[in-house]
Design a protein with these regions (language model features):
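A short acidic, Gly/Pro-enriched loop at the edge of an enzyme's catalytic core
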Residues: 121-132
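A short SAM/SAH-binding and catalytic strip from SAM-dependent methyltransferases
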Residues: 132-145
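Conserved class I S-adenosyl-L-methionine
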Residues: 20-63, 77, 101, 108, ...
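N-terminal auxiliary segments of SAM/dcSAM-dependent transferases
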Residues: 2-27
Length: 288
């Protein structure tokens, strides 16, 4: 006969469910993010991603004369790609030093682009002001994801399109985020930017889209060696620079080891160089 289960002692109350983590102070998070993106020089890294802006503009089938807004534009990869297609482009970011790099690049190519400091979570434009709204690896880093998505949707005209390039959680860059977060945890309750690289999250952020096309693409990081990639990102990529600066010496060494191990897992080169494909979603949303 099976032994009956013993009843819990009468004086032992059932365990209370764990309290949810407190909501992060998004204003504080945003200011920290602004400080991170203002440090280093993102353009050193960002210009290597130019091809992503070009292919996104092709996916959107941009036409000459279209009113195009690039949000969280950084050093202007999508901005320049749209301007090269003779679109009427407005390039925005909340970090003016990043826009300065975009201005320099546009001037070098004699491209006519309007640059304006603006936060994607509070865009200073009228409803439906643009035919297309773009962001390559930019809007995904906003503190308030729902508000950023709502603002992009608002300023896009009916019948217009929103184009995004977002790193996936399982790809190389998504795993870089995860590795850094294991050493320098983000504020409790803050959503990962890599969620923008999932169809499920896109459907949540843009519930009224007439269609969402989000094929998986791959950008290939090519560097002299894994150590070369780490040196470049550690010196110039603001979020990584800040992460290393926040750690003691042994913590910095541990993060370096983990990042190099991650590169080794993704690296397809066997000649000492670094050739690492990184998945991202190339997103085209249609607004009815």
């Amino acid at each position: 006969m099976p032994t009956p289960l013993a009843a819990p002692p009468p004086d032992r109350a059932p365990s209370a469910p764990a309290a949810p983590p407190p909501a992060p102070d998004l204003a504080v998070v945003k200011e920290r993010q602004r400080g991170a993106w203002s440090s280093g020089d993102y353009a050193v890294v960002g210009t290597t991603l130019q091809i992503v802006g070009e292919t996104l503009c092709e996916a959107l089938d941009l036409r000459a004369g279209s009113r195009v807004l690039d949000v969280a534009a950084g050093n202007g990869n999508a901005t320049l790609a749209a301007a090269r297609r003779w679109c009427d482009v407005t390039s925005t970011d909340y970090v003016e030093s990043l826009l300065d790099r975009g201005r320099e690049r546009a001037a070098a190519e004699r491209l006519d682009v309007a640059f304006q400091v603006a936060d994607v979570e509070a865009l200073p434009f009228d409803d439906g002001a643009f035919d297309a709204v773009l962001s390559t690896f930019g809007a995904m880093f906003t503190a308030d994801q729902e508000r950023a998505a709502a603002e992009m949707w608002r300023v896009c005209r009916p019948g217009g399109r929103i184009g995004l390039a977002n790193w996936t959680p399982s790809g190389f860059v998504g795993q870089v985020f995860r590795t850094i977060g294991a050493h320098v945890p983000p504020p409790p309750g803050l959503r990962s930017p890599a969620l923008w690289g999932t169809p499920e999250r896109l459907a949540e952020l843009f519930p009224h889209a007439a269609s969402i096309a989000a094929p998986t693409r791959s950008f290939v990081f090519r560097y002299r060696s894994p150590a070369h990639w780490l040196d470049i990102f550690r010196a110039w990529y603001g979020p990584m620079l800040k992460a290393f600066a926040a750690l003691p010496e042994d913590g910095r060494a541990a993060l370096e080891r983990d990042l190099l191990a991650l590169i080794d897992r993704f690296n397809v080169a066997r000649d000492g160089t670094m050739v690492v494909p990184s998945e991202y979603l190339e997103v085209v949303l249609a607004k009815p």
